[in-house]
Amino acid sequence: MVSERSLDVLRAIVQDYVSSCEPVGSKSIVERHSFGVSAATIRNDMALLEEEELIAAPHTSSGRIPTDKGYRLFVDHLAEARPLSPAQRTAIEILLGQSVDLDDVLSRTVRLLSQLTNQTAIVQYPSLSRSRIRHIELVSLAPRRLLSVLITDSGAVEQRVIELTDELAEADIAEIRGAINGAAAGLSLADAAVRLSELPDALADRARALVAPVASALLDQIAANRQDRLMMAGAANLVRTGDDFPSSITPVLEAIEEQVVLLRLFDEMAHDQHSVAVSIGRENDGFGLTEASVMSSGYSSAGADIARVGLIGPLRMDYSGNMAAVRAVARYLSRLLGD
């Protein structure tokens, strides 16, 4: 059974190790923290923590460092809520508030989060498969060429050029625009695809001939853009903390490059009920990231989570500060997309 003081000792070990990158001994704990007990008493507490596999001794030191289990207990029960400073909040509002479109806001988001945390920041694009169609615009580029602009409720804008066999007048384009928006606007991508596939058969001969090629092209456009993807910033931070990956930093770099692993992990984190989900060390074994920690929070549009934003870094990270930054950025991103 771990006592309250032993838990306070664990908190001190995590905080001191994160800040110093040096194993923590009983003497330094007594010197840095106000426990009011002797170093011998602290050593007894550390022995209990080691028995519970919450701390461990590196081979080259008499001090102790947190284990994955120790970090988990810290994150779940000991990490103190640390709000961002007014200056940090102002920086978020100014930088993200200047965004001009979805790509720009996500690019600014990862750069800002990386700067706030000194970690590699990750943001997931809103999945079109979870989005709803706000509007489909058709613009004439030439008599037999249209530009289709698919706009979703998450702010995503997808464009595609449609080549036609017959020339279309402006009145024809207006008729097609009205038909496809009447069928698809307000629906999820999956439901819209069904309605668009059925639409030509529900129209009279002339209207069917006009709408069918455009509906077919829109179906291809929807199918091509339903793959999730990530945007990242701050990968250089991983290189600077390379010593925190004892075996190899390669699996982390490969996960960043290939994205599939992180997308799977983000999908799993979406089921976590905490405002910021944190996956630590061996908890990432199925993803090959046993020497890394990943944290993320969902961001929303129209009241529903549409994707996640977070970061990846070594086990030795400032969990309290990083969780506060991820939470704040996700909330502001949600407000921005909800406008």
Swiss-Prot record:
- InterPro entries this protein is in? GAF-like_dom_sf, HrcA, HrcA_C, WH-like_DNA-bd_sf, WH_DNA-bd_sf, WHTH_transcript_rep_HrcA_IDD
What keywords appear on the UniProt entry? Repressor, Stress response, Transcription, Transcription regulation
Pfam families per the record? Answer: HrcA
A single GO BP term for this record reads:
negative regulation of DNA-templated transcription
Tagged with keyword Transmembrane: no
GO MF terms listed in the record are:
DNA binding
Q: What role is this protein assigned? A: Negative regulator of class I heat shock genes (grpE-dnaK-dnaJ and groELS operons). Prevents heat-shock induction of these operons.
The similarity comment for this entry is: Belongs to the HrcA family.
PANTHER family recorded: HEAT-INDUCIBLE TRANSCRIPTION REPRESSOR HRCA (PTHR34824:SF1)
Annotated HAMAP family: HrcA (MF_00081)
Q: What is the name listed in the Swiss-Prot or TrEMBL entry for this protein? A: Heat-inducible transcription repressor HrcA
What gene is behind this protein? hrcA
